[in-house]
Regions:
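NAD(P)-dependent Rossmann-like dehydrogenase/reductase catalytic/cofactor-binding core
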Residues: 66-134
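Internal alpha-helical scaffold of NAD(P)-dependent oxidoreductase catalytic cores
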Residues: 1-31, 42-81, 125
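Aromatic-residue-lined binding/catalytic grooves and analogous aromatic/hydrophobic interfacial grooves
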Residues: 39
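Short pre-catalytic strand/loop immediately N-terminal to key active-site residues, enriched for Gly-Thr
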Residues: 28-34, 85-90
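Catalytic, metal-anchored helix/loop core of enzyme active sites in primary metabolism
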Residues: 35, 47, 132
Length: 134
């Protein structure tokens, strides 16, 4: 790497003024890009899909958009408290209930695999795009 300790401290100060800074080894930067650099688009796609599903169930688009925006805000606030997402999911999923029925479909459709492959593809693309810099 060509960055000095002073460069790192400057970047941390600038970026830290608008958010949390996590320092990772240079070898992990492509994975970070694939996960959180592309992550907002993954979440926006989930929001789009939920909005489309709500409309397909007969809800008005403007109502659906408001509900899904608030769903993401509320869910993000809960995540920000530091609780494990698995525990949060369990706390809102009653056995045999409506949420459990929906989760079963998502798991059967391999949602975890889809996200893992998306992160892997974005990570690999980051490696390709950055290859000329190494």
């Amino acid at each position: 790497t060509h960055a000095t300790q002073a460069d790192l401290e400057w970047a941390q100060a600038v970026l830290g003024s608008v958010g949390i800074v996590v320092t990772v080894p240079e070898a992990q930067l492509d994975a970070v890009t694939g996960l959180v650099g592309s992550g907002p688009a993954y979440l926006f796609l989930v929001a789009e899909a939920l909005m489309d599903a709500g409309v397909a169930e007969g809800l008005p688009r403007d109502t659906v958009e408001l509900l899904i925006r608030q769903l993401f805000v509320g869910s993000a606030a809960l995540l920000a408290q530091g609780q494990d997402p698995k525990d949060l999911r369990a706390s809102v999923t009653s056995p045999g209930g409506t949420t459990a029925a929906g989760i079963a479909i998502l798991e059967a459709q391999a949602i975890r695999t889809a996200f893992a492959e998306a992160v892997r593809a974005a990570t690999e693309r980051s490696r390709q795009l950055g290859g000329h810099l190494r």
